[in-house]
């Protein structure tokens, strides 16, 4: 009865499995159930299988024996032997009751307490978890299979070609008997490439009679994919690369000592493109470009470097790092000395100074004055209503008062020679004689001069009378000039 129920259980499990996936341990367990023959004392635990797929059909029979067997059926298959039953020892195994709905009941503890729901929600192990997709790679980098050259849309083409060429050369040299024919080597390189590199090897007519076929393919890749004319003029291309490396090493600068690793890496990569005999000069140039510790490191390198270490940039970089660590340790000591109390110096040695004035800096203490806040009074003055506050005031109509200077004037009149008024305000301006004299003086270009002397001053002028008619006209002119002066 147990075997028939087990067979139906396995068939039902595979039917309900559907698109789900099993782990390796679950798959091995199901294979054992299908292939191996079960002994009487063998115990198989099916609790690791998914409970949703493991559904057991219970066969209902009319006999009392079948009902009791199906109601108390255990997934741990096996019966104790007669020897074990005689001894009274019973095997301990986990009992799992099967429900009609197909779910398994959680095994009870020894004390009878039911386990919490925490075990049901327990995180699955790595074996039980299923990854529908592969883990994501670093964005921007195209993953290629091991040993296959694929340089389509790659930025580091030269590095990939060099690594691939080294691998092909190693395969050919370690298996010389298998790769004596150039056709075999080309076939190997064709199967070890993909993309545009494979199309180049397949569609190119190679010279199989002379030269190394591997070197021909690599030079062609340098020409086609890197733009370096290695096929026609390999020596000139290498000389050009050396000149560019020398120019870059000359232009390199290190302004911040924290970028020492990046600077060393760039300098070293370009230095190894030049000749080995020129390495000592480039190493001295490298040390002179390093700030703060470059001079001391250069002195140490000249004294300590000997033999092959003269050509080693790594030895120079090691000296630089040692000097840098010394400076860092010194800076840490200086920070600690700031916190050191000088009063403790008398503990080690007695003072040798008696009556000497100690030089100390004057301490300046800045007093912090608290800002005095004025007492806030929540008092608001009542606003008065102003009718014309936002309007232009009206202009007052009426005659404006003329400016009238007060007090006596301190000027002197030209006509009467009296102080206190101008000539146009003189009451004696109607006198024709003085006006005639002033008119004649103006014609001669004379200007009146005010003298500080008191009293009446007289002005004399010499006149020449030619005809009487002229004098009469001059008198009439004098009267007109007086009128003009009055108008002025």
UniProtKB/Swiss-Prot annotation:
State the InterPro entries in the record: Caulimo_coat
List UniProt keywords, sorted A-Z. Answer: Capsid protein, Host nucleus, Metal-binding, T=7 icosahedral capsid protein, Viral penetration into host nucleus, Virion, Virus entry into host cell, Zinc, Zinc-finger
Q: Return the Pfam families for the record.
A: Caulimovir_coat_dom (PF22909)
Q: Which family does it belong to?
A: Belongs to the caulimoviridae capsid protein family.
- Recorded protein name is Capsid protein
For the region Disordered, what residue ranges are annotated? 79-142, 464-488
User: GO CC annotation: what is one?
Assistant: host cell nucleus
Q: Where in the sequence does UniProt note compositional bias of the Basic and acidic residues kind?
A: 94-130
